[in-house]
């Protein structure tokens, strides 16, 4: 539609539509017309593409045909779910006027705005996953970041100091919708995300943000939340809260405070580490064979979501971790028994959010009632458990006898989906409702009596009384007897073989019945809203209870997993180091068909770095990752897959494991590898756990070995981080002779003829040889290629043995007798087929400068 179209050139209905659309220019407007929601103009074209619905035309307005698309009102939720998954938003416009009394178009207004980050309807949400709305702010001092889960009221803020930390936060929280200011500079950080919303700068104004937040929480200042001076975070939080108020168009009583998340409270993991450890998402983007897939057998959706939050935010507070360990130990004997009533509790957290937003449906209230009915059994099971943390959680669970009684009296056993058609409020709850219902429900008896009376009085055996939606109540007589009806019978409808009549008595009763049905429905809707008013004052205790029930679910789940998977309770020490006896990889051991070979690990201030050698497929990466996962699980408070484990203080986990070309950002494998390595060397500390796998393999041997050597040296002598350093460069196995705190370990294999058996067991000392050719044969490389490779290997080995510089130290790292010129080295490493024309031109200039 052209901007200069005048409103008055359109029909009255289209004028109404265009006024409403002008208030929501950037989102799809679903405009209720009878039994359909219609979309017009550009909205119709977009919706037809996004939702795969027909694009038609509706007459003409202002002299032009109007593009139109529509969806039936009863299936709107399915279409909204699809839009939300695509990161789109929609405004829902309803008819609020009465068509019977309206002059001109029926009055309509937008009653809700559905956006990916503000949905609370269970049909639109993924049950076992948090759905977050986030806002981001950035200036010279760093970033401000706020997240809100509207389906629980959980409001968090943080102030990431730099781009890498901000990227890690975005990956950890994975918001469904992200608000950002119009002058946001590092767009590369967010541009690949769904659900981006550009907001004007004034929405991030600091004083307005403080005012909005104090108003929401009913406080004079934000000191009690520890965020008064967090100006960057508050700007983001203010914009986020305003956006939620604008879209929800209702009060938000379940959002009662906000929490500042500080990096030092948890173990810091960057985006690469989270990806490499496959916590909740595997490297292919799925959820199979992840740590969560093995660990999450929670019986409530809210417990499952909490466990995933724990996985992504391991904590360092020994007191909290010890509480969790003791609770898991205390629950092991009753875990299965406790999970039975917990399973019946369901998703109380999200039901309470819908209650707060006054969008809870009748079945939500029935589920809440069912949850309350489980609490006595949960109390019975947990009261004998003599663990302080369990008893503390039990006191938070509480009992809600009065609310349970209210819902048992007020709501029918199996309520309908919507309150719209009535039948939700139970008989006996309200005397006036029962009277009006009796009138409406008494219609059947009355009609039966009327039919018998009239048939006998008039002697017409074909006479019967009925009802249809168009003509209401009627008396029907066959065509053959219609001449016998009395004069006060007024003809209402003629059929092929019968006539239908109305009499004053029946008309009077019809009016009374229809009035009583309407009256009963109005009373019922009023009572339903009244139940909300009776429940809402208890919202804080109910939210506390839901949170405690979710944590009990997580702890019972971890207790069951520990028992089933043979995990042990780790010791959390304040002395630096990691000592693991019989450690296993929690995911690989479940996927493997043969028994998993467990392995020990010792890291300490005197043994800070392990140089790990051994064949490809020998288990180096598995050994490294299992160490990180055991450390991470220990900082959940969980038991760990090991015979015994003692874990000292850890501040960060870094992984440089495997890489693929980051084509979207135009970065090669080697560039990705070096970027991640630089991040580690800049940010690791003495208390960090660092996994380095095959550093330098993305470039030439000469460069690669130099880089690997320098990185290992730096980590061991300057940073002194606890490091697992897997490598194929056997020259690195001489490092322990030159530096203190470095040791060699290797994974063994046995070669028999042309076959190879991987032992998967970690031994002290360096590997005696590489098994690259045996692995190549195993992978199906043709035998003649393997044979030629063996010949070449012998030639190279003899050349290497004759070389003058056969040993390496930090000052001289010559691999061959003569140094290869850099230009030749670069050319050898170059793959011409992978270069774009522009990259090829750049390389010509680069090589020219090298010569």
Swiss-Prot record:
Single GO MF descriptor: ATP binding
Chain residues that bind ATP: 614-621
Biological processes per GO annotation: mismatch repair
Record key words, sorted: ATP-binding, DNA damage, DNA repair, DNA-binding, Nucleotide-binding
GO cellular component annotations of the record: cytosol
SMART domains the record matches: MUTSac, MUTSd
HAMAP family: MutS (MF_00096)
Family assignment from sequence similarity: Belongs to the DNA mismatch repair MutS family.
Name under which the protein is recorded: DNA mismatch repair protein MutS
Chain's gene name: mutS
């Amino acid at each position: 539609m052209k901007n200069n179209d005048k409103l008055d050139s359109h029909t009255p209905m289209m004028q109404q539509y265009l006024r409403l659309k002008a208030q929501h220019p950037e989102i799809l407007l679903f405009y209720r017309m009878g039994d359909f929601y219609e979309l017009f103009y550009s909205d119709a074209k977009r919706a037809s593409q996004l939702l795969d619905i027909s694009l038609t035309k509706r007459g003409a307005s202002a002299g032009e045909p109007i593009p139109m698309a529509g969806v039936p009102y009863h299936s709107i939720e399915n279409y909204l779910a699809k839009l939300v998954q695509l990161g789109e938003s929609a405004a829902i416009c309803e008819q609020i006027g009465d068509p019977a009394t309206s002059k001109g178009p029926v009055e309509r207004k937008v009653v809700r705005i559905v956006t990916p980050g503000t949905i609370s309807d269970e049909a639109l949400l993924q049950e076992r996953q948090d759905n977050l709305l986030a806002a981001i702010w950035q200036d010279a001092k760093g970033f401000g970041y706020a997240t809100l889960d509207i389906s629980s009221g959980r409001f968090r803020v943080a102030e990431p100091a730099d781009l890498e930390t901000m990227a890690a936060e975005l990956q950890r929280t994975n918001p469904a919708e992200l608000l950002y200011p119009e002058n946001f500079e590092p767009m590369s950080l967010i541009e690949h995300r769904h659900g981006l919303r550009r907001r004007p700068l004034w929405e991030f104004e600091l004083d307005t943000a403080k005012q909005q937040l104090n108003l929401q929480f009913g406080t004079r200042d934000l000191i009690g939340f520890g965020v008064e001076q967090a100006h960057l975070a508050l700007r983001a939080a203010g914009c986020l809260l305003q956006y939620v108020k604008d879209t929800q168009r209702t009060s938000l009583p379940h959002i009662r405070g906000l929490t500042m998340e500080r990096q030092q409270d948890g173990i810091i993991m960057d985006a690469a580490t989270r990806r490499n450890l496959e916590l909740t998402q595997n490297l292919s983007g799925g959820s199979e064979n992840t740590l969560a897939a093995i660990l999450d057998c929670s019986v409530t959706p809210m417990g499952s979501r909490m466990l995933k939050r724990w996985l992504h935010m391991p904590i360092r507070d020994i007191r909290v971790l010890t509480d969790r360990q003791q609770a898991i130990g205390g629950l092991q004997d009753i875990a299965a028994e406790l999970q039975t009533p917990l399973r019946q509790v369901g998703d109380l957290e999200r039901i309470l959010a819908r209650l707060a937003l006054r969008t809870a449906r009748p079945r939500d209230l029935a589920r809440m009632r069912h949850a309350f009915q489980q609490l006595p059994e949960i109390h019975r099971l947990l009261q004998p458990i003599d663990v302080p943390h369990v008893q503390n959680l039990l006191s938070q669970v509480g009992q809600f006898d009065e609310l349970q009684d209210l819902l048992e009296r007020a709501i029918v056993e199996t309520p309908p989906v919507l309150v719209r058609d009535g039948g939700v409020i139970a008989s006996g709850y309200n005397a006036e409702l029962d009277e009006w219902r009796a009138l409406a429900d008494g219609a059947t008896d009355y009609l039966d009596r009327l039919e018998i009376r009239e048939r006998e009085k008039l002697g017409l055996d074909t006479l019967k009384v009925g009802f249809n939606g168009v003509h209401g109540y009627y008396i029907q007589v066959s065509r053959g007897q219609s001449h016998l009806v009395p004069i006060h019978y007024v003809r209402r409808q003629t059929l092929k073989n019968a006539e239908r009549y109305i009499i004053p008595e029946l008309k009077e009763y019809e009016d009374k019945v229809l009035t009583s049905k309407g009256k009963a429905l109005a009373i019922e809707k009023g009572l339903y809203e009244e139940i909300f008013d009776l429940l809402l004052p208890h919202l804080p205790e109910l939210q506390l209870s839901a949170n405690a029930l979710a944590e009990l679910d997580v702890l019972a789940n971890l207790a069951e997993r520990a028992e089933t998977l043979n995990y042990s309770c780790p010791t959390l020490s304040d002395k630096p180091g990691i000592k693991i006896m019989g450690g296993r990889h929690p995911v690989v051991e479940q996927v493997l068909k043969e028994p998993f070979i467990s392995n020990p690990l010792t890291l300490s201030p005197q043994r800070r770095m392990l140089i790990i050698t051994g064949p490809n497929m020998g288990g180096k990466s598995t050994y490294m990752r299992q160490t990180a996962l055991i450390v991470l699980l220990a900082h959940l408070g969980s038991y760990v897959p090991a015979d015994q484990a003692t874990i000292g203080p850890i501040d960060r986990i870094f992984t440089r494991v495997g890489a693929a070309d980051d084509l979207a950002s135009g970065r090669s494998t080697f560039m990705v590898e070096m970027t991640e390595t630089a991040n580690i060397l800049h940010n690791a500390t003495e208390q960090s756990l660092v996994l380095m796998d095959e550093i330098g393999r993305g470039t030439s041997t000469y460069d690669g070995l130099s880089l690997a050597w320098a990185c290992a040296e730096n980590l061991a002598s300057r940073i002194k981080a606890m490091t697992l350093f897997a490598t194929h460069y056997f020259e690195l196995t001489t490092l322990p002779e030159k530096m203190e705190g470095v040791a060699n370990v290797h994974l063994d294999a046995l070669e028999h003829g042309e076959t190879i058996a991987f032992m998967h067991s970690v031994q002290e000392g360096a590997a005696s040889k590489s098994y690259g050719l045996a692995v190549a044969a195993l992978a199906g490389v043709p035998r003649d290629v393997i044979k030629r490779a063996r010949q070449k290997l012998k030639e190279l080995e003899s050349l290497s043995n004759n070389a003058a510089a056969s040993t390496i130290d930090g000052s001289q790292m010559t691999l061959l007798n003569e140094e290869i010129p850099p230009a030749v080295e670069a050319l050898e490493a170059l793959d011409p087929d992978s270069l774009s024309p522009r990259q090829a031109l750049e390389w010509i200039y680069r090589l020219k400068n090298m010569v």
